[in-house]
Amino acid sequence: MKKEITNNETVKNLEFKGLLDESQKLAKVNDLWYFVKSKENRWILGSGH
């Protein structure tokens, strides 16, 4: 069970790192970007124009 939790945490960390990498690319665009976590525990990227 402990290994499963560790694997899940690793996947979440990799997903979050990917989101941060993407946000750095998007930050170069003059716009407002945000992240929201859904009820299904998924990250949603949005833009406010």
From Swiss-Prot:
Organism: Bacillus subtilis (strain 168)
Induction: Repressed by AbrB. Induced in stationary phase in LB (rich) medium; the transcript is present in log phase cells grown in modified competence (MC) and MM media.
NCBIfam families noted in UniProt: expor_sig_YdyF (TIGR04077)
Name under which the protein is recorded: Putative exported peptide YydF
Gene name as annotated: yydF
Function of the molecule: Suggested to be the precursor for an exported, modified peptide that has antimicrobial and/or signaling properties. Synthesis requires YydG and YydH; the peptide is proposed to be exported by the YydIJ transporter. In the absence of the transporter, the modified peptide activates the LiaRS two-component regulatory system, possibly by eliciting cell envelope stress. This activation can occur in trans in cocultured cells lacking either the transporter or the whole operon.
